[in-house]
């Protein structure tokens, strides 16, 4: 199962511009569907009667494949030239997994079915994300990236498009200075991801809540939602089968994979651990988003928990409006604003303010925990403010990742390690989040999350100090 790569020189892509890019929004939309499904799964488990501690533990365990990303990168590396096959295969597996979960929700073994089939979906989503990041396209002539590196690029070949962490990064090659300058253009890809999250966390959550009211059957309602999500994945698979470049034309090719072959991983890792700047960056990835690690699972559970349990008691429809719609739009706006400020003023000026902004999500939830009877408008405003601040901080994290991987022979491995270290605290803290809720209430958790912004401020200052000469 490999895409055959012809040895002859590639001819320019002759298809129309619109036809060439029909796969562009759908790739990013498919990447956002995975996050939406995890949110839907968490709410579904609570609506089906699973307690808070078990729900948090289940979602954290389902997120474990994210920590195996460097290993998955190695697996994909040994299937050279199969980027399109990975994309299509993982989307088909995702569709089958969601359909299996939807089928088991009607039975008494719904929990066993969810636990058995959801790991297939999560693993396939990680592989899909890896394949997406390796999918290179020349925007002008449709030639291989290796051809551009082996010869002096023409003005038409000057712009390459790379997918990196859900953001389109344009690499402008300069033949006169022989260096690459990276500029971020996140508006389009951020918009596609936002649409996917709005569809999954907003529209589908709203449908589930309305179906619960109409049918008075929770199992049927959520089974229908998962069948629809499986249909979306199947449609994307069919769409990419038709419009995704590759196959006999060979427009897709994996990017350089230094450090992902046998023996190279240890060498690259040792080299990384000997550089003080790299150690500082690795520490930054682990600790900067530490305040958000406590909120990633506890905040949604707080929104849907009953008032007598210390929550707000939002219905699925209200959750879809606040967390699935307004909060998603807010985090996208904050992310876009952060990218613009970095482009205008640079990272050093805004890294410390963004660390302080990480206290806003916890403070907003702390305010709501003391005002559980607040109207829906106040809840929506507080969540929007917190997510806008989080989006602004995430844009800073993204820029640090870009600097960590830029102009490195093992940039693919570095990108995988960076994403793994960012996700590790979320998974580990999420495993104990449910147990923490049985010992302390939401107010204390949100207070601790707000205070943890001190760690973010400290590691941001350390990063600025270590990179001051650059």
Feature locations, PLM:
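Helix-loop boundary and gating motifs at the non-cytosolic
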Residues: 9-66, 280-284, 288-306
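C-terminal ends and interior cores of transmembrane alpha-helices
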Residues: 92-108, 356-374
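Intracellular loop-helix junctions on the cytosolic face of multi-pass helical membrane proteins
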Residues: 2-17, 105-114, 127-128, 132, ...
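Helix-to-loop junctions at the C-terminal end of transmembrane segments
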Residues: 68-82, 333-349, 437
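Hydrophobic core of transmembrane alpha-helices in multi-pass small-molecule transporters
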Residues: 29, 110-128, 374-394
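Intracellular juxtamembrane helix-capping segments at the cytosolic ends
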Residues: 127-141, 174, 392-407
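Transmembrane alpha-helices of Major Facilitator/SLC transporters
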Residues: 65-69, 319-343, 361, 426
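A late C-terminal transmembrane helix in Major Facilitator Superfamily
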Residues: 408-439
